[in-house]
Amino acid sequence: MSESLIIFSREWLVTTSLTAYLVPVYFRPVTSVYDMTELTRYLRTQPRSPVVLGLRPHEHVTDLYRLQPLLAGRAVLFVSRSFYWTDYSLPEWLGLEQFGFCSWDTIHNPFSRRREMRRFKQSAADVQEDDCATDGAKRQAPAASVITGMQILERANRWLYRELSAAGLNGFEVRVLSLMSEGLKGSLSSRTRSLYKNTGLLKLGMTKHVLNLYRGVKVRPELQAGLHCPDGESRRKVKESGMDEVEILHK
């Protein structure tokens, strides 16, 4: 029997909306998960099940790092309104092999949604074929680690820094982006600094918008959000409103 698609987001409304969108087009069992304990349990008991995560990796580095033993060896799809270079890069650092990204615009469009799910199902099937040598039942849950959340972020940032050069940035662009992401200017003139910043961001697939510099070059402690769903009160209010979850998400 094939294992189900697991859907999870730290926001209950996002989880239910993703479920409403994907159930009609996935054509296989779908399991909606609403808290970290439940997510860990399903990842452990269904080691080959594909996972849809309604989040951006750069905002959940610590939790994803600790979940890495359970996320590795399966297809993972990240869904959000937008992504940054950090988001596209971090799954590789986390040791994920089959992963993808999908915007809400894609999810909202029926044609692109079906196309994305076909692609994702094929990716999941490829993973399951390649994973025959691994006994998923023996895969362990994330162990409590002595490494702190700050140390995890530091490790991620050291890796991201090295990846800037691998992405094609020259030494000046790497230096300028690193300094400016810390709010520093360095000794270059304003015009030269702006030039290297813009060309560096362009090589990373981002525009010169300041938000890309803030979120897209390194991971930050102040942007980290724990993977915990809101309390049952917000969930109850949505049900009592009588509105469809997908409708609310559009508001």
Enumerate the language-model features and the residues they cover:
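N-terminal regulatory/sensing modules of transcriptional regulators
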Residues: M1-A144
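Solvent-exposed, well-ordered amphipathic alpha-helical segments
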Residues: S2-I6, P24, L43-V51, R74, ...
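Charged/polar, solvent-exposed surface patches and flexible loops
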Residues: A20, P24, R41, P69, ...
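Generic structural signal of hydrophobic/aromatic residues within well-ordered alpha-helices
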Residues: L39, A156, L160, V210-V217
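Phosphate/pyrophosphate-recognition segments in soluble nucleotide-handling domains
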Residues: C132-A141, V146-R162, L223-K237
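Helix-turn-helix DNA-binding segment
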Residues: V146-N198, L202-L204
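Basic, Lys/Arg-enriched C-terminal extension of HTH/homeodomain DNA-binding domains
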Residues: N198-K251
